[in-house]
């Protein structure tokens, strides 16, 4: 049977045994990819600096998902938080990868078995002897089983009752660790940044799924609904399954891009909105004011700022700074962060403190402008020196560093001051190693950006797939060219076509 590439799936349309076989093979490929990708990432991952070179800077994609579910140790003797590990146990990163690869092999064998032994009695209607599936019953079974799994995940894994819990951190991504989570049953459970909502929603959705599954197993659909929604046609299953998948893809694209308790910044990197709103800058400022209230010097106050917090407040970690065709990890862009130089404080010759205006997310270049506390422009790096009034040289701008590697060092040389003013546009100033990875200096996106782009794109494609297959199954008689006023009911069977004399006819 010569089929074009876009029609090949018709071979399993009326063949339940081989329909199972191809789904088993698909699951084998997914599981095998997950395990293989995990092993590849573990081979290239450098766990030595979880503060300045975390997994998301290195472009890791599956390691963050394992970590948020409670995996933190490696058979290589390291932990994601930086400690040395002596006994990682079976549920290490490598252990999870191996389990996926073994599962992939077993699914591969199962797929072959079902392809060979496709004609099972299980799939034949006792009355007609023809291949058939009780799709509403199968729907009930799947709904029940997925409900059990969903409930078990929320009630046992997330709560720590039988499992590790999940990755929990503070809003600024400083104190993350795996710990059990109590379900949040109040209104706070609907806050996407409250981890307790993950437990309570899985428990509630699981119970709903179990009840709905039992309902569909015990109650048959009315005949008009069965016919109206084409419940006897396997393409209806395909259409509604695609709908479930694209809906889920749109949801997770949103929770990833805008941030949520399920996508911690320690594992996936900060969101673009944290840069846009000065989220980390405000927290740093609050801590500095708090330290000054305790009569600490500026140097002491800035030295108390965690390097991790300062690193978040750097535009190169903004996932929206990457470009669509800039492949690779963040480290391949601006380089591997080596150390924080400290906070640069600029002053004019009168001693007034000046603040460098930060670059907005969607700018590649931005004028260097220094403003005072009232937001009035006091200095800049002019485009045309002939017309300049506020140049660094004219205003006499100096820079002094507090905290970090250059703590207490000041510069008055205009060229050096301008260099640090340009770098201060990008947030806190860090030293980068661009030689090791031959980094090109062009910003890359984090896994947060890639995940969002991928899932939003595929969700859109799958949306069209849902419309396509839904229309095909709902309007199958129209597409087949059958007159709706025909007085004989035409039953569709295997390889049936219009005008086939063997078609069963039943007078209405």
From Swiss-Prot:
<keyword id="KW-1133">Transmembrane helix</keyword>
<dbReference type="InterPro" id="IPR036001">
    <property type="entry name" value="PS_II_antenna-like_sf"/>
</dbReference>
<feature type="transmembrane region" description="Helical">
    <location>
        <begin position="140"/>
        <end position="156"/>
    </location>
</feature>
<keyword id="KW-0150">Chloroplast</keyword>
<feature type="transmembrane region" description="Helical">
    <location>
        <begin position="203"/>
        <end position="218"/>
    </location>
</feature>
<keyword id="KW-0604">Photosystem II</keyword>
<keyword id="KW-0602">Photosynthesis</keyword>
<protein>
    <recommendedName>
        <fullName>Photosystem II CP47 reaction center protein</fullName>
    </recommendedName>
</protein>
<feature type="transmembrane region" description="Helical">
    <location>
        <begin position="457"/>
        <end position="472"/>
    </location>
</feature>
<dbReference type="InterPro" id="IPR000932">
    <property type="entry name" value="PS_antenna-like"/>
</dbReference>
<comment type="subunit">
    <text>PSII is composed of 1 copy each of membrane proteins PsbA, PsbB, PsbC, PsbD, PsbE, PsbF, PsbH, PsbI, PsbJ, PsbK, PsbL, PsbM, PsbT, PsbX, PsbY, PsbZ, Psb30/Ycf12, at least 3 peripheral proteins of the oxygen-evolving complex and a large number of cofactors. It forms dimeric complexes.</text>
</comment>
<dbReference type="Pfam" id="PF00421">
    <property type="entry name" value="PSII"/>
</dbReference>
<feature type="transmembrane region" description="Helical">
    <location>
        <begin position="21"/>
        <end position="36"/>
    </location>
</feature>
<dbReference type="InterPro" id="IPR017486">
    <property type="entry name" value="PSII_PsbB"/>
</dbReference>
<keyword id="KW-0157">Chromophore</keyword>
<dbReference type="GO" id="GO:0009523">
    <property type="term" value="C:photosystem II"/>
</dbReference>
<comment type="similarity">
    <text>Belongs to the PsbB/PsbC family. PsbB subfamily.</text>
</comment>
<dbReference type="GO" id="GO:0045156">
    <property type="term" value="F:electron transporter, transferring electrons within the cyclic electron transport pathway of photosynthesis activity"/>
</dbReference>
<keyword id="KW-0934">Plastid</keyword>
<dbReference type="GO" id="GO:0009535">
    <property type="term" value="C:chloroplast thylakoid membrane"/>
</dbReference>
<feature type="transmembrane region" description="Helical">
    <location>
        <begin position="237"/>
        <end position="252"/>
    </location>
</feature>
<comment type="function">
    <text>One of the components of the core complex of photosystem II (PSII). It binds chlorophyll and helps catalyze the primary light-induced photochemical processes of PSII. PSII is a light-driven water:plastoquinone oxidoreductase, using light energy to abstract electrons from H(2)O, generating O(2) and a proton gradient subsequently used for ATP formation.</text>
</comment>
<dbReference type="GO" id="GO:0009772">
    <property type="term" value="P:photosynthetic electron transport in photosystem II"/>
</dbReference>
<dbReference type="GO" id="GO:0016168">
    <property type="term" value="F:chlorophyll binding"/>
</dbReference>
<keyword id="KW-0812">Transmembrane</keyword>
<feature type="transmembrane region" description="Helical">
    <location>
        <begin position="101"/>
        <end position="115"/>
    </location>
</feature>
<keyword id="KW-0793">Thylakoid</keyword>
<keyword id="KW-0148">Chlorophyll</keyword>
<keyword id="KW-0472">Membrane</keyword>
